[in-house]
């Protein structure tokens, strides 16, 4: 009898051993939750550090080809953290801009893209600085191009190594934004432009979650290039009076905020009109 009971226990317990674990309904696993190659969050961080180190080496080479600077000038060549740093940097760059035009432009271009790619604060000061260093049309094109390229590089970086981190630390926010993107899938460029003009979502969040929720790279770049133009217009215009500013907040006036609000509404109007037209036709 004892043997028979033992046999029954083994037969009853065996299906439990062989049964495959099912994912919990409370924490659904997102589609494609693993990055290519099934890299873990730890491996992704390691790859990110390696890519950052390589990019920093490129930045070092760019600034190594900079003209010979005095000791005092060398101390001012750094990523601006406040308006005083931006003024000091503007003084040095304006001195060498005419003689070493290509080197200064390349250094500005590379630095802006570097900051955008790795979501490092400071690009707002470079936008203001462009208005001080260059003619307005060139400054606006330069800032829009750098923002578009830098954000696209951040997008690709997130696509390659950032997915595990997004799923681990930003799952809930990414899922909420994914639902919003699905609602505007037919008018995604207008939606990206609207988000870039308005402060509803941080730019770094848009950059790193867009590849995870399947925003196409082409749409992402174009929406960013066009969407950053209005805020950049304000910053560049403020750069013409750089030395009168004491903080970055002074670059934005009530008039400029009103203009940005109007442009944000204009960017989303075609979507509203098309939806109303579709409702009437139906």
From Swiss-Prot:
Deletion phenotype: Morpholino knockdown of the protein causes severe defects in motor neuron axonal outgrowth.
InterPro entries: TM41A/B, VTT_dom
UniProt entry keywords in alphabetical sequence: Autophagy, Endoplasmic reticulum, Lipid transport, Membrane, Neurogenesis, Transmembrane, Transmembrane helix, Transport
Region called VTT domain, residue ranges: 131-242
Region (Disordered): 1-36
Membrane topology: Multi-pass membrane protein
Localization per Swiss-Prot or TrEMBL: Endoplasmic reticulum membrane; Endomembrane system
The reaction(s) this protein catalyses: a 1,2-diacyl-sn-glycero-3-phospho-L-serine(in) = a 1,2-diacyl-sn-glycero-3-phospho-L-serine(out); cholesterol(in) = cholesterol(out); a 1,2-diacyl-sn-glycero-3-phosphocholine(in) = a 1,2-diacyl-sn-glycero-3-phosphocholine(out); a 1,2-diacyl-sn-glycero-3-phosphoethanolamine(in) = a 1,2-diacyl-sn-glycero-3-phosphoethanolamine(out)
Sequence intervals crossing the membrane: 43-63, 102-122, 138-160, 188-208, 216-236, 251-271
GO BP term, pick one: autophagosome assembly
This protein's record includes keyword Transport: yes
Molecular-function GO term, any one: phospholipid scramblase activity
Keyword Protein biosynthesis: no
Pfam families named among the record's database cross-references: VTT_dom
A GO cellular component annotation in the UniProt record: mitochondria-associated endoplasmic reticulum membrane contact site
Biological role stated in the UniProt entry: Phospholipid scramblase involved in lipid homeostasis and membrane dynamics processes. Has phospholipid scramblase activity toward cholesterol and phosphatidylserine, as well as phosphatidylethanolamine and phosphatidylcholine. Required for autophagosome formation: participates in early stages of autophagosome biogenesis at the endoplasmic reticulum (ER) membrane by reequilibrating the leaflets of the ER as lipids are extracted by atg2 (atg2a or atg2b) to mediate autophagosome assembly.
PANTHER family the UniProt entry points to: PTHR43220, TRANSMEMBRANE PROTEIN 41B
Free-text domain note: The VTT domain was previously called the SNARE-assoc domain. As there is no evidence that this domain associates with SNARE proteins, it was renamed as VMP1, TMEM41, and TVP38 (VTT) domain.
The family this protein is said to belong to: Belongs to the TMEM41 family.
Descriptive protein name: Transmembrane protein 41B
Provenance organism: Danio rerio (Zebrafish)
Gene: tmem41b
């Amino acid at each position: 009898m004892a043997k028979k009971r033992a046999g029954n226990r083994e037969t009853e317990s065996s299906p439990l051993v062989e049964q495959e674990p099912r994912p919990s309904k409370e924490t659904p696993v997102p589609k494609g939750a693993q990055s290519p190659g099934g890299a873990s969050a730890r491996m992704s961080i390691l790859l990110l550090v390696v890519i950052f180190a390589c990019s920093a080496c490129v930045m070092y080479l760019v600034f190594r080809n900079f003209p010979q600077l005095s000791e005092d000038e060398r101390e001012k060549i750094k990523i601006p953290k406040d308006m005083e740093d931006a003024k000091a940097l503007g003084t040095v760059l304006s001195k060498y801009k005419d003689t070493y035009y290509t080197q200064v432009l390349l250094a500005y271009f590379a630095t802006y893209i570097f900051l955008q790619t790795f979501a490092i604060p400071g690009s707002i000061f470079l936008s203001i600085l462009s208005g001080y260093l260059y003619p307005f049309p060139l400054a606006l094109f330069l800032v829009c191009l750098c923002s578009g390229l830098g954000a696209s590089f951040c997008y690709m970086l997130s696509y390659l190594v950032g997915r595990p981190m997004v799923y681990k630390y930003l799952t809930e926010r990414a899922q909420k934004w994914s639902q919003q993107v699905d609602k505007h899938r037919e008018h995604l460029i207008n939606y990206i432009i609207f988000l870039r003009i308005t402060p509803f979502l941080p730019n770094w969040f848009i950059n790193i979650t867009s590849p995870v929720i399947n925003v196409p790279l082409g749409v992402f770049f174009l929406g960013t290039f066009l969407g950053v133009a209005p805020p950049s217009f304000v910053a560049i215009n403020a750069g013409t009076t750089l030395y009168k500013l004491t903080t970055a907040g002074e670059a934005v006036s009530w008039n400029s905020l009103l203009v940005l609000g109007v442009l944000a509404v204009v960017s989303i109007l075609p979507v509203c009109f098309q939806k109303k037209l579709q409702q009437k036709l139906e």
